[in-house]
């Protein structure tokens, strides 16, 4: 009798879908001050880990992140590896994540991705990314930087990789200018990613609406 009860419990556990694993990343834009808010948006729905670049740390407050979110920096890439055979952090994070969301995406990191550069933890993850899994970017930069011809070329490169753009919005920017280039609000980024994920899951299960 006890064994039958345990078997039923095991079946219930096995049929419970796990939460999506979302890797959130911030690069060096003043919009990184909203990164803690972004993490909070995702934590109830998904299992979240965070990666930040060195320059983003000038803007974001580590204490603003939810306690359950593990934060990784460039230093962790090297401190976690001592010898051949040890886990490589950017590979482990790429394997762990179901979805990667870069918000904010700075002009500098945009250029690095488009050029295939991998000189920090975040860009190494992107270079090693499995593009059968979704990757979203939410750019944030000055209006003139956003309108620069290089930006258009870089965005085309991202589109060819299958990266999904969450476009910036028009508002008063941190520099005082008014125009396009502000990062989309964290709530919009969250809803965009969740809607995409749930629509993909719906298609895979053969559901119809």
From Swiss-Prot:
This is Phosphopantothenoylcysteine decarboxylase. The gene is HAL3A. The record marks 175 as: Important for catalytic activity. GO terms for molecular function: phosphopantothenoylcysteine decarboxylase activity. The keyword Lipid metabolism does not apply. N-[(R)-4-phosphopantothenoyl]-L-cysteine binds at residues 142, 172, 174, 183. Binds 1 FMN per subunit. Changing residue 177 to N: Very low activity. Can reduce the oxidied intermediate. InterPro entries: Flavin_trans-like, Flavoprotein. Gene3D superfamilies: Flavin prenyltransferase-like. Its EC number is 4.1.1.36. Involved in plant growth, and salt and osmotic tolerance. Catalyzes the decarboxylation of 4'-phosphopantothenoylcysteine to 4'-phosphopantetheine, a key step in coenzyme A biosynthesis. The enzyme is also able to decarboxylate pantothenoylcysteine to pantothenoylcysteamine. Expressed in roots, shoots, leaves, flowers, developing siliques and seeds with highest expression in seed embryos and phloem.
């Amino acid at each position: 009798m006890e064994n039958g009860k345990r078997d039923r419990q095991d079946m219930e556990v096995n049929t419970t879908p796990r939460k999506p694993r979302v890797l959130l990343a911030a690069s060096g834009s003043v919009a990184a001050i909203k990164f803690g808010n972004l993490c909070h948006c995702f934590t109830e729905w998904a299992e979240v880990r965070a990666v930040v670049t060195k320059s983003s740390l000038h803007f974001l407050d580590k204490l603003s992140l939810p306690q359950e979110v593990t934060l990784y920096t460039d230093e962790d890439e090297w401190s976690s590896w001592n010898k051949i055979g040890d886990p490589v952090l950017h590979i482990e994070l790429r394997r762990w994540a179901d979805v990667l969301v870069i918000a904010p995406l700075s002009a500098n990191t945009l250029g690095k991705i488009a050029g295939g550069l991998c000189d920090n933890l975040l860009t190494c993850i992107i270079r090693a990314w499995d593009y059968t899994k979704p990757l979203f970017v939410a750019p944030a930069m000055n209006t003139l930087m956003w309108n620069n011809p290089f930006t258009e070329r870089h965005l085309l490169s991202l589109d060819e990789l299958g990266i999904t753009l969450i476009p910036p919005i028009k508002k008063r920017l941190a520099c005082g200018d008014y125009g396009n280039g502000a990062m989309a609000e964290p709530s919009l980024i969250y809803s965009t990613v969740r809607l995409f994920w749930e629509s993909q899951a719906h298609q895979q299960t053969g559901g119809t609406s």
